[in-house]
């Protein structure tokens, strides 16, 4: 029971509820999106992000993903609009990916799995701290972007070039002057629903904005992401791959689309 969660058979998503009961809750993420069942909601606004590149601080390998951390001590890098009631502060972004190009995303669209999924995590500063926001149904807003295989994305390469400094679990390196909006697709259409973090403790505090249009990266770029290790420097090497949670039951939740 007292084991660290992970993605292996003995500590993977099927076991998370043993340590974190909410992982079997009614508002868990990710989910399967069935576009024929999703209604367009004309009241949904466009969303916008104004990110300060100077707020990017570090990149780290925590053994579960690679994460870029931002300064969120004041309103520097903000997400607004869409289904949100007010502005949200960017705290970090991270990725989920598979062991090969044909899977790796957490959400699926009409059965399609993408090669990876990028999550930009923001919190609602009306709750004063990130920790307080985690306890509120509208505490967190995550922009999810699918990665599909195609031509190389130059802006993504900036991130990948930093991975050599964080090959193994526990490594952290400076990562500054980066505006993640350079990764956004041209089309801002999105789906939205109420869900949870896709990693333990799986708190159900998230307003999801899932972008319809994926970001295109090359197969070589995905291979670079898979060159990370989930093991520490002094341990036998274990590749960091397959860090995705499968879709969870929708349980009557409504998914809305910002587009027809």
From Swiss-Prot:
SMART domains from the UniProt entry: Carb_anhydrase
Keywords, sorted A to Z: Acetylation, Cytoplasm, Glutathionylation, Lyase, Metal-binding, Phosphoprotein, Zinc
GO biological process: one example: response to bacterium
Regulation: Inhibited by acetazolamide.
Catalytic activity: hydrogencarbonate + H(+) = CO2 + H2O
Residues with PTM N-acetylalanine: 2
Disulphide bridges: none
Membrane-spanning residues: none
Tissue-level expression: Expressed at lower levels in adipose tissue from animals that were either genetically obese or had experimentally induced obesity.
Modified residues (S-glutathionyl cysteine): 182, 187
Gene3D superfamilies registered for this protein in UniProt: Alpha carbonic anhydrase (3.10.200.10)
Cofactor annotation: Zn(2+)
PANTHER family to which the protein is assigned, alphabetical: CARBONIC ANHYDRASE (PTHR18952), CARBONIC ANHYDRASE 3 (PTHR18952:SF127)
Function: Reversible hydration of carbon dioxide.
Family: Belongs to the alpha-carbonic anhydrase family.
Protein name: Carbonic anhydrase 3
Species this chain originates from: Mus musculus (Mouse)
Lineage: Eukaryota, Metazoa, Chordata, Craniata, Vertebrata
Gene: Ca3
């Amino acid at each position: 029971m007292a084991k660290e969660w992970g993605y292996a058979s003995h500590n993977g998503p099927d076991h998370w509820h043993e340590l974190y009961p909410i992982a079997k809750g009614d508002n868990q993420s990710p989910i399967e999106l069935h576009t024929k069942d999703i209604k367009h909601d004309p009241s949904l606004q466009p969303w916008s992000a104004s990110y300060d590149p100077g707020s990017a601080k570090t990149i780290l390998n925590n053994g579960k993903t690679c994460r870029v951390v931002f300064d969120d001590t004041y309103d520097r890098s903000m997400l607004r609009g869409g289904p949100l009631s007010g502005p949200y502060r960017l705290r970090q972004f991270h990725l989920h990916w598979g062991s090969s190009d044909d899977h790796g995303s957490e959400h699926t669209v009409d059965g399609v799995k993408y090669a990876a999924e990028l999550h930009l995590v923001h919190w609602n500063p009306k709750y004063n701290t990130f920790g307080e926001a985690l306890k509120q149904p509208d505490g967190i807003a995550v922009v999810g972007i699918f990665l599909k295989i195609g031509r190389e994305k130059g802006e993504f390469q900036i991130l990948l070039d930093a991975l050599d400094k964080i090959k193994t679990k526990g490594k952290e390196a400076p990562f500054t002057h980066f505006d993640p909006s350079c990764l956004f697709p041209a089309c801002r259409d999105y789906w939205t629903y109420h869900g949870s973090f896709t990693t333990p403790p799986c708190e159900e505090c998230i307003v999801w904005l899932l972008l319809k249009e994926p970001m295109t990266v090359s197969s070589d770029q995905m291979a670079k992401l898979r060159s990370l290790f989930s093991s520490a420097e002094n341990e036998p090497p274990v590749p960091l791959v397959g860090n995705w949670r499968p879709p969870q039951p929708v349980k009557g939740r409504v998914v809305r689309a910002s587009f027809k």
